[in-house]
Amino acid sequence: MLRDFSVQSLFMGVLIAFVGFASSFAVVLHGLTGVGANEAQAASGLMALSISMGVCAILVSTVTRLPVSIAWSTPGAALLASSGVVEGGFNAAVGAFLVCGLLIIIAGLWKPLGRIVSAIPPALANAMLAGVLLSLCFAPVKAIAFNPLFGLPIVLAWAVVGSVSRLYAVPAALIAFVLVVALGIDMPEGALAGLSAALVPQAEFVSPSFSASALISIALPLFIVTMASQNIPGIAVLKVNDYHPDPGPLFATTGLFTLLSAPFGGHAVNLAAITAAMCAGSDSHPDRARRYWSSINAGIAYVVFGLLAGAVTTFVSLAPSVLIEAVAGLALIGAFSSSAVAAFTNAETREAAAITFLVTASGVGFAGVSGAFWGLVAGGLMLALARSAKGKG
């Protein structure tokens, strides 16, 4: 196994971890605080997720000898940001994370549930995701309106670097954010001391509680979004690169690591979609049989980044929240545009997808349940009625 290691896979692994962490950690923090986490709990959740996905990547790639890339659920974090605090607060959200992990395990081991997830029309799943992401993608505009001197550098860095390489667009925006905070924000007394103290990793256990509203508003939509937007595309990327793993055990393993991270604030661990292509492609290594080391190296780097989560969260908290939300919004624009296109491409499902999108994007909940769930229900009913009428005709 050690003979398969290469410097090329080392550099690619570190790059994968940097891109994966830097491009979406802001979304994770925004999502966790959106469902009631305080700063310490959000830092703990970020650390738990990063370490869990790192260990998961190392374990899976070592056992299978396949370049399986692992990530946290960025669309799932975006869903959390739009869900709001449910009855029971963050404890209830953690209970929902546990249920989501259990559902992912069942989907991997029990094929009927996996088939049910696969039976959800892709147009509706994408419309729900696009509806969740819409309000978050407004954040860059709001940041510019809040303070052009702070917001514009972040957006311009993303746009200029993105015109050359989409891969580095969000990391460039993140660097601009760091410079804005360091040079433009008045640091409170003791800020540097606080950053130094935050370098010591601190996991915070959150006792889970369970409520019907949290299960329906968070657990079910999080499970659907994670499976439809991360796990299933992750398998597809591997197949495109001529790797053919059994999906079930991979899904179940990510579900297990979701269960392990949830009590410390982590929402979902899953197969990666974007960085999966980096792991499995020829840039990872010319020899297909040796590319799995890129995933192992990425896993090691994720663990290191996870140990720095407290310092990252403390630094982010020094700036107005709208600025880090702008970075998160920029990170989600690509996901929003691809989801919107996929939702409205098929004429047969377009109207039902529009209903799903609008109900979800409205952010309006009923009976303590978020709009994401009701959007999927409304779109599903619309599609069923349309197909029923067409069948009778």
Can you describe what each PLM-predicted range is?
Residues 79-86, 158-161, 276-290, 294:
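Interfacial segments of multi-pass membrane proteins
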Residues 64-77, 117-125, 244-250, 267-276, ...:
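Short, non-helical or kinked segments that cap or interrupt transmembrane helices
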Residues 2-6, 30-59, 220-292:
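Membrane-embedded helical hairpins/re-entrant loop segments and their flanking transmembrane helices
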